[in-house]
């Protein structure tokens, strides 16, 4: 369990619609968060982890036109690591991410993210082959919405939200020569 709290008192200058002068903007930001993980290991071949977390935001200001924000972001999910026949290692994670309480409807979202990895080592552990699938349900968005200390900002991320990748990794040790 991991509880956190944060307070930010932000002072800035803001333009008000219909006015030619800037106005002092004072915004108080409270953030409360908690995370919880429960792990269960049946034996060396089966391990499961339940995880959940969330943050609650309380943002208010006396500034003209500012709408108080009472919003939350939370997630809940399950991880599994299973050893399959032929020494294959299966790792999977499915997590639901949700955002609620925002004035803009595009910020209130529910996204299910499912990732899978299948791995096997060869040559006494020196060579590892992995097949990874990220965001198999195709719900991850390129657009990320963030609320800063003065209001809402929208940032765009240039990324590949979903992919399947095959990789090979060679592990080698180089020992220093003795003098």
Predicted region positions:
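Exposed, low-structure sequence patches enriched in small/polar residues
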Residues: 1-179
């Amino acid at each position: 369990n991991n509880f956190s709290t944060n307070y930010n008192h932000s002072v800035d200058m803001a333009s008000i619609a219909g006015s030619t002068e800037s106005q002092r903007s004072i915004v108080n930001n409270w953030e409360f968060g908690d995370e919880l993980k429960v792990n269960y290991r049946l034996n060396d071949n089966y391990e499961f982890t339940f995880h959940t977390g969330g943050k609650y935001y309380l943002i208010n200001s006396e500034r003209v036109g500012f709408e108080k924000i009472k919003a939350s972001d939370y997630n809940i999910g399950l991880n599994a690591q299973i050893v399959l026949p032929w020494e294959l290692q299966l790792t999977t994670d499915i997590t639901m991410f949700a955002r609620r309480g925002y004035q803009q409807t595009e910020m209130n979202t529910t996204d299910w993210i499912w990732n899978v990895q299948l791995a096997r080592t060869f040559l006494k552990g020196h060579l590892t082959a992995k097949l990874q699938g990220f965001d198999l349900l195709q719900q991850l968005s390129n657009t990320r919405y963030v609320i800063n200390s003065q209001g809402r900002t929208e940032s765009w991320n240039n990324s590949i939200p979903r992919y399947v990748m095959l990789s090979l990794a060679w592990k080698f040790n180089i020992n220093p020569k003795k003098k």
